[in-house]
Structure formats: C-alpha cells, structure tokens
Amino acid sequence: MKHVMVNGTFDILHRGHLEMLKFARQQGNFLLVAIDTDRRVQELKGDDRPINNQEDRKFHLMCLEFVNEVKLFDSKEELIEIMKSYKPDVYVKGSDWKAGTGTAHEYSKEVIYYDRVGDYSTTNIIQRITNR
C-alpha cells in the first residue's frame, strides 16, 4: 500500500482544496490529511480564524471519499511526530511551499508539489463575503 500525506488548515473547503486532495489521493492508496488545530490557526492567521472549528473541518474532510484519515496537530513538532509514525511514501505540498528542503523531505520518500488550480483561496472567499 502506498501512503500519501498532506497538511493544511482547510478552513472553508473550496474547489482548490478538493482538486489538491483528489490529486494527492491519486498518488497512492491511502490519504492522511493533517490539519492545524484551532489554536494554531489563530496563531498563524489571526484571532478571527478559523471560520470552521477543528472538529467541523475534520468532519468535512472525512466526508470526502478520497480522504482516509484526518489527524490534528498543534505545533510543527506534532506534525513531525505524525510524519515519523505515518512514514508517508509521498508528501503532497502546494507549489507555493517550494522554498528550500524542509520537514516533508526529511520524513517522506518523495515530495510532490501541486500547482494551484485557479485562484481559489479561503482568505479571498472571506473577503468577498465581508465586503458585501
């Protein structure tokens, strides 16, 4: 079995997320998605985020047929522990995260960078909603 892993916030699930997750699953037989806890999202993106709490985000992802498992992480160290225990064959990252070699390169056999489809963005969706 070929294991694939991705991580992210996945706050307001949109087509860009879905395209990337579908692509990730096509790289193997089993897809693990690691998502930031609410505390971590607030730390990274501000007090008004996330829009959807971690349990709702986890539920949304688990409803997708191409996602097999979802784990929460609260720090980079916790993400590394997930990677160490899961030992992904493939780690899929957005191509906007190509800078240098990082954690994904250390704990997976292969890293594949995924180019975004369109200009989908949770931040843009929030801005469009609040500007109406």
Q: Regions from the language model: what does each represent?
A:
Residues 1-132:
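Nucleotidyltransferase catalytic core that binds NTPs
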